[in-house]
């Protein structure tokens, strides 16, 4: 509808009925000039009683709430008189100011109260009971809310998602609006998460020429960033030009000219390699080339160790009461003589035994060995299986945000290396090229590196296919374990996992041992069954408590996606109660007792241990915890991440999601006592053999498939391995003189 056709209302906010702090959506009562109340819905971040506004929109009829005014645009004016200012502040407009404090401030400064709050906070300290620190805190809160409100109103006026404004303010602070006006394309940057289409629409409406170099260059960089999120280290130049041209409706020739400009300016790194005209983002080019050089150097290094490997093996077998298989002995021999070794194999093939053996051998030789894994859960599992502390790669390298907060830096690096003689890295298939390069750069020149993983599992979420490329290069000493040891091969989880990996169809009707299939043809029936399994059947019949059960799904979307499953599981496992405070955030409710997962790395968040004996910073993507408190007054929640206690403001809840159910990708690197795998319809890109295989291998004692056999068979038959543009394999072979 044309803006000129919109109706206009004006008045003063009487009350706020509902507000969504994630996206600014608000339902409020507006008192018009005649004193009549009107229900208005729209985007009004931090709306509070007492402020005046003019809203443009139309009347709509809600099926439940009746007639209300839906605002498309708004002009908001802060109150200017002392009574209105008091009403505004007393209504909770500014965090930390309630009715009593509002009365003190307004009585002191009258009509100038808001000016003092914004520009002269030191004057607030003249009031008894308000310290200088609190005065500054109140002023900061007021300025922040004013800034977010202006930014969100600007974004909403162009019909864009309000959440983008929230992210922008969190990232850029008070400069966000000015930066956005100067360059609308920052909306499409990785840290803001807007689509290029949204940024482009804003730019074009602001008058930017469709063929401008700024627009085309922004689209090119967006394509590279977008494809790095799909696992690519580079994009062939011709493909980059074609994709960008299609994205913004220009000719490929116009794009190619600007690619050349970006190459000349250093914003794109170009190289002809692997038969491709490869265009890289600079950070990915540097990571790939540097990682290849370090690995190649390590491959050329051998140790003329005088230790007798046969004596070492005999001593280890005697002390550990074990007899190593031939391939496990080969692992020990290679680890003794080479600087870098790869160990791969499926479930039950003895990878853990081999890790313990290598660790024991290094200990016997007086070597200091560090254990690490990509995720907190994988590191914890490594600790439990070896008896030695393991840490995440991020924690090992002491990751943190740089001074600008724009990117991550690692304290441990080439200029401040790790203190060790060897590193054993588990779940290597999850490691992308950026993280692998960071780890390699931090290794001491003589340190050994043992890379362990299952090459048939899903590749990393981030760019590259590092573990596979290293193995396929043929230049790194590699042992592939094939003999099944676990439970003497009696585990149906293990046997069926290997069948799935070979493309064979297990007999899903054979419900016995540790592998079961509950056939459900309707998604609603599957959801009901999964909920029942978690709440009663497994706890009561198999004595497996809900905290030891993990529900997995290939997808987030749909009835059998994690979002819907978590909604049902929360209602069943942690329903509302008087002693469980909760916070609505968007479409999600966070409640005391909820199982939650960190979904992005936060290097700065502070945590302490339960006993208060130690503290640190950093909660990382994939960490699982339980909400222990929800503080509505101070607007924060506390999460216990397996003994590490961290606090979150309500504005940081974007970093959390419920975790009774999670995607198979998120579960990679973890092992659970019992896994329930929900099989329903989803994108063919997700319903693949490697997704199925990865899901099955997450279960330690029990796996239950819930769904229909046809879906399972389709996944096994869908051997669809996504092609990733990466040149690590080729670089390794060239540097080692093979090509």
Question: Model segments located where?
Answer:
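A generic structural signal for residues embedded in beta-strands
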Residues: 16, 55, 598, 627-630, ...
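Loop/turn positions that initiate beta-strands
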Residues: 50-52, 593, 622
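ASCE P-loop NTPase helicase motor core
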Residues: 234, 329-332, 338-511
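C-terminal accessory regions
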Residues: 502, 610, 621-739
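Pre-Walker A segment
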Residues: 272-347, 353
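Accessory, non-ATPase domains that flank or precede helicase/AAA+ motor cores in DNA-metabolism machines
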Residues: 1-308, 739
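Conserved helicase motor core of P-loop NTPases
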Residues: 455-617, 628, 735
């Amino acid at each position: 509808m044309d803006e000129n056709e919109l109706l206009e209302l004006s008045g003063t906010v009487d009350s706020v009925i509902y507000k969504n702090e994630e996206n600014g959506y608000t339902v409020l009562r507006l008192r018009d000039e005649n004193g009549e109340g009107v229900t208005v819905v729209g985007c009004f971040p931090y709306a509070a009683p007492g402020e005046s506004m003019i809203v443009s929109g139309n009347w709509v009829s809600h099926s439940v709430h009746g007639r209300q005014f839906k605002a498309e645009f708004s002009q908001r004016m802060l109150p200017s008189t002392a009574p209105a200012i008091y009403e505004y502040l007393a209504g909770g407009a500014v965090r930390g100011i309630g009715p009593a404090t509002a009365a003190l401030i307004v009585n002191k400064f009258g009509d100038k109260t808001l000016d003092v709050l914004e520009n002269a906070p030191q004057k607030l300290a003249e009031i008894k009971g308000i310290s200088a620190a609190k005065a500054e805190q109140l002023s900061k809160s007021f300025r922040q809310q004013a800034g977010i409100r202006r930014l969100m109103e600007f974004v909403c006026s162009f019909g864009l998602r309000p959440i983008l404004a929230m992210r922008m303010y969190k990232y850029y602070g008070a400069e966000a609006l000015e930066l956005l006006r100067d360059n609308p394309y920052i909306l499409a940057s990785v840290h803001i998460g807007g689509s290029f289409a949204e940024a482009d629409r804003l730019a074009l409406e602001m008058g930017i020429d469709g063929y401008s170099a700024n627009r085309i260059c922004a689209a090119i960089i967006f394509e590279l960033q977008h494809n790095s999120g799909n696992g690519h280290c580079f994009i062939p130049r011709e493909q980059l030009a074609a994709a960008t041209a299609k994205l913004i409706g220009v000719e490929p020739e116009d794009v190619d000219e600007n690619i050349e400009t970006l190459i000349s300016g250093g914003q794109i790194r170009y190289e002809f390699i692997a038969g491709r005209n490869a265009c890289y983002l600079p950070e990915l080019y540097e990571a790939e080339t540097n990682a290849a050089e370090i690995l190649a150097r390590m491959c050329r290094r051998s140790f003329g160790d005088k230790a007798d490997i046969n004596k070492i093996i005999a001593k280890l077998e005697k002390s550990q009461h074990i007899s190593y298989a031939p391939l496990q002995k080969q692992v020990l021999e290679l680890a003794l003589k080479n600087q870098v070794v790869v160990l791969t194999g499926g479930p039950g093939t003895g990878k853990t035994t081999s890790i313990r053996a290598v660790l024991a051998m290094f200990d016997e030789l007086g070597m200091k060995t560090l254990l690490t894994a990509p995720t907190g859960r994988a590191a914890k599992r490594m600790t439990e299986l070896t008896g030695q502390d393991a840490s995440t790669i991020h924690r090992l390298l002491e990751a943190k945000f740089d001074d600008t907060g724009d990117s991550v830096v690692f304290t441990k690096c080439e200029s401040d290396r790790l203190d060790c003689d060897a590193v054993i890295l588990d779940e290597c298939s999850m490691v992308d090229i950026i993280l692998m390069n960071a780890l390699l750069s931090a290794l001491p020149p003589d340190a050994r590196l043992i890379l362990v993983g299952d090459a048939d599992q899903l590749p990393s979420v981030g760019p590259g296919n590092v573990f596979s490329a290293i193995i396929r290069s043929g230049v790194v000493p590699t042992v592939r374990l094939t003999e099944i040891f676990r439970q003497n091969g009696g585990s149906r989880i293990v046997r069926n996992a290997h069948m799935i990996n070979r493309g064979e169809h297990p007999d899903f009707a054979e419900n016995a041992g540790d592998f079961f299939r509950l056939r459900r043809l309707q998604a609603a029936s599957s959801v009901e069954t999964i909920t029942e399994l978690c709440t009663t059947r497994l706890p009561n019949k198999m004595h497996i408590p809900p905290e030891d059960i993990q529900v997995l799904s290939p997808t987030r979307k749909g009835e059998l996606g994690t979002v819907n499953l978590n909604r049902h599981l929360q209602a069943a496992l942690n329903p509302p109660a008087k002693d469980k405070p909760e916070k609505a955030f968007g479409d999600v409710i966070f409640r005391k007792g909820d199982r939650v997962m960190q979904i992005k790395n936060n290097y700065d968040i502070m945590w302490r241990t339960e006993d208060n004996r130690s503290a640190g910073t950093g909660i990382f993507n994939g960490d699982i915890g339980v909400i222990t408190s929800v503080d509505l007054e101070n607007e924060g929640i506390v999460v216990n991440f397996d003994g590490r206690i961290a606090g979150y403001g309500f504005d940081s809840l974007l970093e959390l999601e419920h975790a009774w159910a999670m995607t198979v990708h998120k579960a990679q690197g973890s092992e659970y006592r019992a896994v329930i795998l929900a099989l329903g319809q989803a994108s063919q890109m997700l319903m693949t053999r490697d997704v199925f295989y990865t899901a099955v291998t997450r279960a330690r004692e029990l796996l239950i498939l819930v769904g229909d056999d046809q879906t399972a068979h389709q996944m096994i038959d869908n051997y669809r391995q996504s092609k990733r543009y990466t040149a690590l394999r080729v670089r390794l072979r060239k540097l080692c003189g093979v090509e």
